[in-house]
Amino acid sequence: MDQSSRYANLNLKEKDLIAGGRHVLCAYIVKPKAGFGDFLQTAAHFAAESSTGTNVEVSTTDDFTRGVDALVYEIDESKELMKIAYPVELFDRNVIDGRAMIASFLTLTIGNNQGMGDVEYAKMYDFYVPPAYLKLFDGPSTTIKDLWRVLGRPVVDGGFIVGTIIKPKLGLRPQPFANACFDFWLGGDFIKNDEPQGNQVFAPFKETVRAVNEAMRRAQDATGQAKLFSFNITADDHYEMLARGEYILETFGENADHIAFLVDGYVAGPAAVTTARRAFPKQYLHYHRAGHGAVTSPQSKRGYTAFVLSKMARLQGASGIHTGTMGFGKMEGEAADRAMAFMITEDSADGPYFHQEWLGMNPTTPIISGGMNALRMPGFFTNLGHSNLIMTAGGGAFGHLDGGAAGAKSLRQAEQCWKLGADPVQFAKEHHEFARAFESFSHDADKLFPGWRGQLGLAA
């Protein structure tokens, strides 16, 4: 059935929709399936299925219903581009406080339309949230400024937080795990649980929490510097998340503000993120996106992009989210990921299709991880343009020939090298841990800095 007469209006202008302030706008790349309708017909069916319609006309539709139809307002078949305007009235709101929810946004904009028989593929690349609706989202309650404050740094441009993920990600018992934490903290700032770590039979949660607490206290005494840890509290059960969080805060006592809470936001979903955001508003909310590649990967033509995921995370209240390495690490990514970092940190930013004003909503910190080491960092910082972020290097720290503490120091020295605008090989001559990173990650060194061995006086 051709629904374009109802669910499409190509005379609508985007600037007028934005000025009106009552529509969420979404941009998709879409391809109709062969043998069905043309591009506009498929787009209109997509809008119908995403809002007030179905595959047939129904007798219960009235004039009010038609007033909240989602409308296709722009198409470009040559680019497979479709833009849809969703009236904000369509989206569910909390009974308890009238706040907005990402679960409803996803259900409409990327829900049943992903399984439509006449759509070969459809993927969301950007979305725009109008001011009145944006204000209904929680947004972050804490930011990187809170971590800088704990670390004793300036709360403006406090700089690089040197972090790690204890490796191996699974298989360490509580005390060896805590020992690795202590080792890294002798040179670094921040440690996170890897996303599967929790309450395994060989590493009971409470025993691990107590051991890490002791390691943090010893490291702080040894260095005279504050240390940070991000504990995974992800669970299927809301009450399990609360129990984990409360036990951690009770155990760490006066060091509670040194603790972030990690939530596997993609696999556990918006409900888990919001549980952590609302139950523990004083803690830094660390959004891990494990599993997101199933829909965000450039190889996937369905779902939504990592850019969209990160923008949703800011709305939900993530203090920080993993944003990839812009092609500098081992995970999928590209230099264009820079736009993602700007979208979640700035108060006014351009996405692939829409400009977004955040109206003072707290920023979300980019958390960089996945195959990074000290040699890759100067180029990464140059591409991003600043170093106000958290990086969690697992192999990049513990793969250092001299151990985790030296690995952490090499990462910090990499930032110093970039800030000075120094040549990395020349800088290495006067910074031992950074120099040893060349030997530790020689494959990267050969690729990034040909001839480094001779310059550092090492045999080829």
Swiss-Prot record:
Family annotation (SUPFAM superfamilies): RuBisCo, C-terminal domain, RuBisCO, large subunit, small (N-terminal) domain
User: What EC number(s) is this enzyme filed under?
Assistant: 4.1.1.39
Which cofactors does it use?
A: Mg(2+)
For the site labelled Transition state stabilizer, the residues are: 330
Molecular function terms from GO? magnesium ion binding; monooxygenase activity; ribulose-bisphosphate carboxylase activity
Protein's UniProt keywords contain Nuclease: no
User: Where do the annotations place substrate binding?
Assistant: 112, 169, 289, 322, 369
List residues, modification N6-carboxylysine: 192
Note on cofactor: Binds 1 Mg(2+) ion per subunit.
List, in alphabetical order, the GO biological process terms annotated in this UniProt record: reductive pentose-phosphate cycle
Positions annotated to bind Mg(2+): 192, 194-195
Keywords on record: Calvin cycle, Carbon dioxide fixation, Lyase, Magnesium, Metal-binding, Monooxygenase, Oxidoreductase, Photosynthesis
Q: How does it assemble?
A: Homodimer.
Q: What does this protein do?
A: RuBisCO catalyzes two reactions: the carboxylation of D-ribulose 1,5-bisphosphate, the primary event in carbon dioxide fixation, as well as the oxidative fragmentation of the pentose substrate. Both reactions occur simultaneously and in competition at the same active site.
UniProt record similarity statement: Belongs to the RuBisCO large chain family. Type II subfamily.
Q: What else is known?
A: The basic functional RuBisCO is composed of a large chain homodimer in a 'head-to-tail' conformation. In contrast to form I RuBisCO, the form II RuBisCO are composed solely of large subunits.
Family matches, as NCBIfam families? PRK13475.1
Protein name, per record: Ribulose bisphosphate carboxylase
Organism of this sequence:
Rhodopseudomonas palustris (strain BisA53)
